[in-house]
Structure formats: structure tokens, C-alpha cells
């Protein structure tokens, strides 16, 4: 599911990070630069 600006402001389940592209994940690619929510 999409999150952040691309997902209408939605956050990710389970505390996952929302990447700059609006996708949920737990790796630095998602949690690092550009992260939109639940960032590390």
C-alpha cells in the first residue's frame, strides 16, 4: 500500500517507514533520506 503524500497522508502498518516514493519498508532505503513517516 502507498503512504505519505502519495497515499493521501496514510502511515505504514507495524511502524514501517514510508519512503520518499510513498512505499512502506524497513530498510535504510525507506527509512533514510526523504523518508515521510516512522523514520529512523
From Swiss-Prot:
Keyword Disulfide bond: yes
GO process annotations (BP): defense response to bacterium; defense response to fungus; killing of cells of another organism
Function according to Swiss-Prot or TrEMBL: Antimicrobial peptide active against plant pathogenic fungi and Gram-negative and -positive bacteria.
The Chitin-binding type-1 domain, residue ranges: 1-40
Superkingdom, taxonomy of origin: Eukaryota
InterPro entries, per the entry: Chitin-bd_1, Chitin-binding_1_CS, Endochitinase-like_sf
Pfam families: Chitin_bind_1
PROSITE patterns referenced in this protein's UniProt entry, alphabetically: CHIT_BIND_I_1, CHIT_BIND_I_2
Modifications made to the protein after synthesis: Not glycosylated.
Alphabetical keyword list: Antibiotic, Antimicrobial, Chitin-binding, Disulfide bond, Fungicide, Plant defense
Protein name per the record: Antimicrobial peptide 1
Molecular function via GO: chitin binding
Source species of the chain: Fagopyrum esculentum (Common buckwheat)
Disulfide bonds: 3-18, 12-24, 17-31, 35-39
